Every structure is written in C-alpha cells, then in structure tokens.
Amino acid sequence: MTSKYDALLHNQSTNTNPFSKLQDRSSLLGEKFTKVLVANRSEIAIRVFRTAHELSMHTVAIYSYEDRLSMHRQKADESYPIGKVGQYSPVGAYLAIDEIVSIAKRTGANLVHPGYGFLSENAEFARKVNEAGMQFVGPSPEVIDSLGDKTKARAIAIRCGVPVVPGTPGPVEHYEEAEAFVKEYGLPVIIKAAMGGGGRGMRVVRSADTLKESFERARSEALASFGDGTVFIERFLDKPKHIEIQLMADKAGNVIHLHERDCSVQRRHQKVVEIAPAKDLDPKIRQALYDDAIKIAKEVKYCNAGTAEFLLDQKGRHYFIEINPRIQVEHTITEEITGVDIVSAQLHVAAGFTLPEIGLTQDKISTRGFAIQCRVTTEDPNNGFAPDIGKIEVYRSAGGNGVRLDGANGFAGSVITPHYDSMLVKCTCHDATYEYTRRKMIRSLIEFRVRGVKTNIPFVLRLLMHDTFIQGNCWTTFIDDTPELFQLYRSRNRAQKLLAYLGDLAVNGSSIKGQNGEPALKSEIVMPVLLDSTGNQIDVSHPSEKGWRKLLLDNGPAAFAKAVRNHKRGLIMDTTWRDAHQSLLATRVRTIDLVNIAPYTSHALASAYSLEMWGGATFDVSMRFLHECPWDRLRRLRKLVPNIPFQMLLRGANGLCYSSLPDNVIYFFCEQAKKNGIDIFRVFDALNDVNNLSLGIDAAKRAGGVVEATMCYSGDMLNPKKKYNLDYYVNLVDKMVEMGIHILGIKDMAGVMKPKAARLLISAIREKHPELPIHVHTHDSAGTAVASMAAALEAGADVVDVATDSMSGLTSQPSFGAVLASVDGTDKQLEFDNNQLREIDSYWAQMRLLYSPFESEIKGTDSDVYNHEIPGGQLTNLKFQATSLGLGTQWAETKKAYIEANKLLGDIIKVTPTSKVVGDLAQFMVQNKLSAEDVENRATTLDFPASVLDFFQGLMGQPYGGFPEPLRTNVLKGRRQPLTDRPGKFLPAADFDAIRKLLSEKFGVSSDCDIAAYTQFPGVFEEYRQFVDRYGDLTTVPTKFFLSRPEMNEEMHVEIDQGKTLIVKFVALGPLNPRTGQREVYFELNGENRHVTVEDKKAAIETVTRPRADPGNPGHVAAPMSGTIVEIRVKEGAKVKKGDIIAVLSAMKMEIVISAPHSGVLKSLAVVQGDSVNGGDLCAVLEHE
C-alpha cells in the first residue's frame, strides 16, 4: 500500500454496530468520494455495489417502473425510480440523461458508474455528469467521442499504424453510400452501429437482395438500443477469432493491459462464452495485440477501464475493430486469472488514484490458470434463441471451488419480462488448465436448476462438449456454421413436472378417463411373502432360474413347441397382466403395480407356459390414458421376469389397430417387440381371414418369435343351424398348419364355448394334428369357463388361460385356483404351489381395491352371453359406453340390438375390431330408435358410424360367407369403393426415415420403438409425448397419488431413479385468481418450498387472451417470440410474396421481422402497432391467391 492509501485506512471512524461497521467507516477513496450511483440495472449494478461496499462507499440504485421488483434495487443503500410511471419506456428510462443526472445530484452522489450498455458510451452523459460536479467513472467525454464512435476509432487506429478491416471512412447516412461500398469492395460485409455493443445494430449481408433491409434494421436497432442510429460498414472476415485486450489507464498517463480474452464464441455478434487467456495463441501475436492496444490508448490519452477488440484471421493477421470505453460483461474472467478487481480499479482511478498507487504496474500483472464465463440466459435455443418470459418457479444455482456467479434476477419468484436483456447470471469458472476449467463449467451448468422459463443451458452444454471448443479452435461464426450444436441435451425437469401434475390433481382432480371416484384402498400395500417347500422364505431380489424361457432361448421356437406338446401335465397362461385387467378394470393397471409384483411372479409362476402381458388394448391405453410408454413396461418387466415366456396379442395385418396397416409396419413392429422381450406372438384375425392371418404369422416368424396362430371361436358349434360348425374350425386349422405355425391358439372371446363343445373341438383337432400344441383362451362371462377349460385339458389341450382368483371370473378368465383344483389328481394336474399362489393373489386383491374407480357395474355372470355373444372385454366397455351415451337405462335394449346388428352384418366373428363394429351399430340403432328392418330400408341415407363403413368397405378383411347384400352395396353407395382383397395390399409402405425425422424434430432423438408406436397410433403417440413433455414420466408415481387428490401434509415418496427419491408434501392451495382463472399450489419438495400455477378448469376467466396461431394451418402467421409490435408493413387485402415483411417485433432490445410464410393475400391482421404479444400468438392470416 502507498502512504496515501495507508493514511485513509488510519483515519477510519469507529462504530459499535457490527452490521454497519464496514460502511460507517470513511470511504477508502477519500472524503470527496463517498457515494456512487450506478446508472444501470441488474447484474452489473449489483457488481459495482459489491465493490463499492467493500470500499466503504454508500450506493444508489435507479430503476424503471418495470424494474421495481428487480434485485439490484434491493442491493443498494438507496434506490430511486426514474421519472413518473409511464413517463419513459422500459429502455428509455435508463437513457434519460437529465433525469439520471438529477437523481445523482439530489442524492449526493460523488461518482456515477455507467456499467455497460445504455449510457456507458454516451459522451453527452459523461459530460453532464462532470458538469454537475460529479465524477463519471470512465474515460473523458472527449475520449468517448473519439473511441465510442467506431468510425472515429478506425481513423485513430490508422493514424497509429494499427491494421484495420477495410471499411467506410466514416459513418454511413444513406443507403446509396452502403450500396456504393458494396459495389467497390464486394460481399460479404457487416453493418455495425457506430455506438454501443453487445451485437445490437449489427447485420451481416451476404446477398445484395438483403442489403437495404439489413441497413434499415441495423440503423433502427442502433437507435433503439443506444439512442444513436449511426452505422458504418466493413468487409466481413471469414472465420476469424475475436480477441480483446483488457486495458487500464489513469489520469497520469499510465496504461497497462490485463492480458487478453478470447470472445470468439458468438451468436449474431453477441458473445456467448468467453475464455481468458486465449488458448494456444502465438506469443508473438499476443504481444503485438498488447502493443497495438496500448498504442491506441496512449494516443487518445485514455483513462479508466477499456477494451481493445481485434479480429484475428486464419493466417494470424490481426485487425483492430474498436475500443469499448467501458467495463465489459466478460471482465470477470480477467479478474479471475489476474486477481485484479477491475471495478475497484475503476473507482480508484475516477477518484484520482494512479495505477502504481493501487499496486497496478505491468510487471506485477500475471495470469494464473484459465477462466471461462458462460452467460445463462432465458433464451430458447429450440426457437431461434427467442427470449422466454414468465415467472421463475425454481432457481438453484451452482457453487464450489473456482465457481463465481454474477447475477441479479435469478431467484424463485422472479418475473422475466420482455423489456430487457435475457441474462439471468454469469457463471465464471477458474482452474489451473483449460481442460479442468471446461469440465468445471460443465459440472456447474449441470448443477443449475431453472424452472418456469426456458434457458440456454442445454445449448451451452452442447457447445462446451464439442470437439472444436475442446481444442480451443472456435471462430466468430462457429455457432452458425455448426448445426449439430442444436441437437440439444434435454433437461428432464422431473421434480417440477411432477409437481405440475400433482398441482393439477389437487385443483381439478384426476383426468384419467373412465375414473369414477377415488381408490377404495387407503392403507399401505402389503407385499407377499413366498415360502419354499421347506418353509424358508424365498429371496425375490433375484429372479427364479426355473422356467420355460431358457429352453426357448437355447433351442428356438420349434423345439419349444415340441417340448410343450411332449409335456405330460397341463400348462397355463396367466392373463392377469393383460386381459384380466382389460376385462375388469378397463385396462387401467399401471406399470408400477406390475413391476412391484413381478419379482414374486418370477418365482410363484415359474412353471407357467407364459404370461400374457402386452399387446392388444394395453398398448394404446397405456399411452392414451395412463400416459406410460408400453415399450418401457415391456423392458422393465422383462428384466424382472427373465424366466417365464412373455406373450402378446397381435391382430394380424392390423398390428394393434382396428384397421389394416402397411405391411412393412407389421414386420417392423414385430421385430421391435421381439428385441425388447416378447417371446410368443398370439396372432389372430377378427374375421379368421387367412390372408390377414398369414401376414401376421410371417412377421412374427421373421422376427424370431414363437408363432401361436389363433382362430377365433364364435357361436354354438353344437347347434347344427349355426354358421360356424366343427368342419369350419377344423378346415381353418388345416390352413394355419400349412403356414408353418408353432402352436395353435383358440380364442373364445365371448366365453360361449361350452364344455361339451371344448371336448368335441379339441378332440377333433388332436386326432388330425397329434403333434400340434393347442392353447385355449376363454372368458367366464357365463360362469362355465372353469368347466370348459378342464374339459379342454382332458380332451388334449396343452395350455389353458387363467387369471389370479381376485382378478378372475365375470368377463375375465377363469379362476387360477378353481382350474388348479378341477384338474387336481388327473393326468393334467398343474405344477404350482397353492400357498405361493395365494400370496400373489393377496396382492391382486389389494389392487382390485386400488383400481376400484374403474370397476364395471357387472356384478355377476350372464348366461345371456350365449345369445348376444358379446366378448368379455367388450361387455364391460359396452356398458360403460352405453351409460356415457345416456343409454344406461336401455342396457337390455342394447344387448338385443347387438344380436340384431350381428345378424345385419352377416353373423360375423366378434373380436376386436369387428366386435366394435357390432357394438357401434347396436348403439347407433338404440340411439336412433332403429329396427333391423329400418337399417335395411334406409341404408342409403343413414349416417353410419365410421367403423361400420370400414367393415363394409373391406378394410377389416373378408368375412366367412361374404358380405350381406344388398345391405353392403346400399351402405357404401356414394360413399366408398368396396375392396375385394387384403387391405394392406393397397396401402403404401411407411417411410420410417421420414417418420424418424418428424419425431426427432418434434420430440428430440427418437428410437425404433418410438417409430413402431407412432406407426400404430400416430395421434395417441403424439399426445402421450406432449403429456410427458408437460408432466414428465409418471410411471414411478405410486398409483394412490396418481389417481387421488393429494392429502394436505401427507408425504409422498416418489423414486424417480435408482437411489433418487423425491419426498413431496402438499401444503396449501391458493385462492382463485379471477383474472386468470388460475390457482397457486404450494408444496414442500425434499424440504424446500415449491409452488406451481394451475388453471382451475371449473372457474370462469375474466380476461380474454389473444388467439393462438395453429401450427398446422399454413395460413396462420405467428409471433416468433414475445415482444411488442413496433411496425406494421402491409395492410389487409394486400398481396404479399413469400418472405415479405408483414410486421416488425421488438423484444429484448432486438428487432425481429415477421414475414409471410408463402405468397398470397393478407386476409386479416390480428395485431396493431404497440400490441404486446407472446411467442405463438396469431399475428396475421394469409390466403393463397
């Protein structure tokens, strides 16, 4: 310390208040400089306040009306509004020179620090501050005049012999001058604002067609940002580096440098990531840059902090760009590597200290390690970096050794407006080497949690991990030249998304379709305890090693089928994981409850032929209503139960759908199903159409699966008057055997196969095909399924279907325990431990209570099924649908209409999707009070359900015996052309590459399984992904909390990953905001307070929102981001060409054009000048000419 500085320290006054002791001392800058006003906002204002407080100075903040809640106002000792409410625009307030000078004078400020941006390079402001008797913290007004104007700075550099980029000799006032320069020097060129920085007022022009528009936009943006629309033009260098030298000078003429920064990583001329010092810069070039920077500073008698900026071309030649006569955003990295507090030096120099007096001489300035600064902003990289606005719901920052944060409005509850720069915080990391620093920055950015607004963190992480950045070889257009940078890492945001779902549940209740009330189960679920034959408890943390699947994997499908046929005892397939809950609980059982019982099932059911657990309705219901990924369910269960074969239901050429799909979709789907864990494909066709069956059989076979070709059983085979007799079924089996199937399935979906019929049919097939394994499936709607399955086993069937007792009976499968008892002591005795089955069943008894909101109203068996033949799964759904349509009191009429509809359609096989056709027609008849005769007589004029039209057209295949005429012709008349062959033949092959591209653009990287799901259910898949984007993956949320409104102060434990559990407590529900129709919902998350804003769907909303543009409507023109409409270019009714500018939007001090997406006529404008809009709001409607 010098003697002058020591004297100040020794003259400090004493104050007994420890909290004000630091500031109650005299300022370290002397008695003349005790108070500083910062003529700026946000982060840089707080940065100056902090150093000023360390120097025992008092601080003054100023703020606009829009900034009245900004953090910088609270960090100062005093804060004052700029003008009256409405007097200035949000930006204009910080450009109000006279008002700011008046506040500074009135509050007794001695120093005025301009920060960066706004008035920091305005000579008039500096002059007025000095004239008012205060000291401007920065260069003199004359120096600002000479260097702040880039055209004057160029002239100075040329005078000093410092190389500059070829450009206009002075400011360009008129477009004609710009045009003349381009003609002389060629393209590309860059148009730059003469004043200011930060990339604003800059436009690169590569085409003569865009020169005029770019010129006008640069001038307009410069005027809006800096109060001066002057611009100049330079040649644009290709792929240069941007190197800047930090300068510090005093009034005595001392000038030093604080080494360099590499600011090459930019987007639209705005710096994104800065590095100090520059990596691998040639020492000779580095020294030349230092020398030239100091040369210019001395030439103009520079004082205070400043930055000399240079471009370095690919041949190592450097060109002077400008000197920024102010502190820079990125000054932090220089402070980190040099240990110099630049703001402190600024204040000292402004107070009259020389650099040597504060210990700053060139020989004492050295660098230590590397520093990197990243700007965390609320910009959305997926939307052209449009700034996002809204309330920050969660804010958690990084920390640790070598991590520095400079921020302001980054806190939970902060409202990000469209009025100012989008930066939340500057994260600066410092370490011994460039690579250590880079890794530290990555770690720090990953630690950040910002929810409620989008941020650029995913983009910056992608940038930091790019090879070019790792090598330190970036150039100024690197971001624009590297499209792979926009393949972003998606933040999962799991906790906040979970709270959003629970908040919606608290306000609006469950949104799961078909739910009636809340679960009856209120207690904790009790898990089974399995004991082995010796009474010891089985360790279920490891799956059983017993089971049929090992034989299948080791020897293949043919050997597996042979082993099944040679097995002397009976085998079962358990349907609890699919058809049972489809029949009883509307297919609503969730993955988590299957996962919980899976380890126990692996042991207790190790002897099972298979578990039916996938395909059919479970696939689309899991996405559509449970918001789960069916592929994830398959993979998770496969991992837990590797020993028992998994079986799925495949609707032949329909895949999982109700109508035919392109052939390549079926093959692709089966391939993915086999890869992810399916072993046995139970392939059927709803009409027993062998053409449709053959495709599914071939697809399953090519995928490497066990082909269980299945014929659908319907009617009463014992009645000679019925259409489907014994000969029909045996002939059908013959055709399937010829296709090379492994196993025969018989699917009695309505449960109408009587025990005698089972004996007769199985015996006939067994006699003709003694080596063919037979598997029989039924439903217990009539109450005779146990007897039928026992009869089937007795007659020679190898496998029958059962469901655990608590999930059996009625429209489900027969009881496991009852079938087990029925064949006990016979040759077909089943090999299971009764005690273990009871333990498994006790779990499912609890599940029945947990899913009680989805129970059907069917309370007993219905022998009338032998008449109406409604399939078990449909019987439940049809009654629910009838009630939904207001036909609940006409259930008997609906069943009667089902019989009539079936006859009208030609007495068809009834299984999804043909059963839906019969059901739709039946409800149509009841709703419209139509008899069968009415349907026949009025067929040409009735508006039939779409499924009925699909059936008669032939989209579901060809029914046995053909279509009923003339009904078919009359139904289709003037509507559709009938098909006479397999529908899939007429469908074009799916373009998987195009689908992958589409899904990747919409939802990020997409897998083969995503494509397979999309090709089956495109709309359902998109809705599912949109739900997950909004609420996250909810599969691990316990079902009790998934279906029920959260209880106040009840703890919810949700394991979102291995070893990572969220503890959530619902603590309060806020009042309704009548203006927005929303409520605040408050939670504790792992002990921290969190809240979410939820729309109350029952509330009336007072406000009227702007219409939103429909992304699927090519005529809708949307606002690309939030901001204010500053200019309307065309009138309604005008003709426009593609790319013509319709309006200009101003946001975050940037101007963005809204252009026509195609040529046409402007039908209407939805905005006027001055309107505030959000991104995606409708601005205009175009019509094609």
UniProtKB/Swiss-Prot annotation:
SUPFAM superfamilies: Aldolase, Glutathione synthetase ATP-binding domain-like, post-HMGL domain-like, PreATP-grasp domain, Rudiment single hybrid motif, Single hybrid motif
Domain Pyruvate carboxyltransferase positions: 570-838
Catalytic reactions of this protein: hydrogencarbonate + pyruvate + ATP = oxaloacetate + ADP + phosphate + H(+)
Residue span, ATP-grasp domain: 154-351
Chain positions found as N6-carboxylysine: 747
One of the GO BP terms on file: gluconeogenesis
Cofactor(s) demanded: biotin; Zn(2+)
This protein's name: Pyruvate carboxylase
Organism: Schizosaccharomyces pombe (strain 972 / ATCC 24843) (Fission yeast)
